[in-house]
UniProtKB/Swiss-Prot annotation:
This is Uncharacterized protein YcfL. Disulfide bonds: none annotated. One of its GO terms (biological process) is DNA damage response. Transmembrane segments: none annotated. The gene is ycfL. InterPro entries: DUF1425 (IPR010824), YcfL-like_sf (IPR038483).
Amino acid sequence: MRKGCFGLVSLVLLLLVGCRSHPEIPVNDEQSLVMESSLLAAGISAEKPFLSTSDIQPSASSTLYNERQEPVTVHYRFYWYDARGLEMHPLERPRSVTIPAHSAVTLYGSANFLGAHKVRLYLYL
């Protein structure tokens, strides 16, 4: 009887620990552009971010395209990574841009860190 109760309590605790994880979008290390599927449904496409390094600070740009007949507001954030692939903190604040109908907009971001070697752009509605 005691073994059965102990096993049941262990199972419940294991399930609760598994439920505690935060939902995340699975991302490959080489994936520099992450778009939520709702953007594609809204007629938005994007180019991978282009990373430019200079003596002053790294910067990145990416062009977004709106293929629809109405403007679409897109939220975005650039994530910066060091030479070892570690995310650099503090994170940039999320920003927004409204892309006019049948138009393109170029997003620009600058790393506030001298050691940034990689960038990832996250886009969502």
